[in-house]
Amino acid sequence: MIVPLGQVLMLAGLLFVAGLVGVLLRRNLIMILIGVEIMLNAVGLVLVGASAYWRHPDGQLVALLLMAVAAAEVTIALALVVYLKRSRGTIDINRFDGMKG
């Protein structure tokens, strides 16, 4: 049984909006990273859902690539968060103003 594409798009839209709200409203770097990951998962869900709907495997392959890129992104971002926590003592983004002119 294939889930209708409209339902897949609705769920993906809700996930994307939830991730976007998390990114925009949170000041903690880890919570922002979780929001970005939720948004990436929503995009992957759209790719897999559309791929199943049109019975074409390209969307699933791109979703697999997206998962690999997301894993690399999480690894780098968490390394940066650990570095910032050790060097500055906080992960609140309001405290990072070193680039201001």
Swiss-Prot record:
NDH-1 shuttles electrons from NADH, via FMN and iron-sulfur (Fe-S) centers, to quinones in the respiratory chain. The immediate electron acceptor for the enzyme in this species is believed to be ubiquinone. Couples the redox reaction to proton translocation (for every two electrons transferred, four hydrogen ions are translocated across the cytoplasmic membrane), and thus conserves the redox energy in a proton gradient. The keyword Translocase applies. The gene is nuoK. Its EC number is 7.1.1.-. It is a multi-pass membrane protein. One of its GO terms (molecular function) is quinone binding. One of its GO terms (cellular component) is plasma membrane. It is an enzyme of class 7 (translocase). It is found in: Cell inner membrane. The lineage of its organism: Bacteria, Pseudomonadati, Thermodesulfobacteriota, Desulfuromonadia, Desulfuromonadales. One of its GO terms (biological process) is ATP synthesis coupled electron transport. Its main location: membrane. It comes from Syntrophotalea carbinolica (strain DSM 2380 / NBRC 103641 / GraBd1) (Pelobacter carbinolicus). This is NADH-quinone oxidoreductase subunit K. NCBIfam families: PRK05715.1-2 (NF004320). NDH-1 is composed of 14 different subunits. Subunits NuoA, H, J, K, L, M, N constitute the membrane sector of the complex.
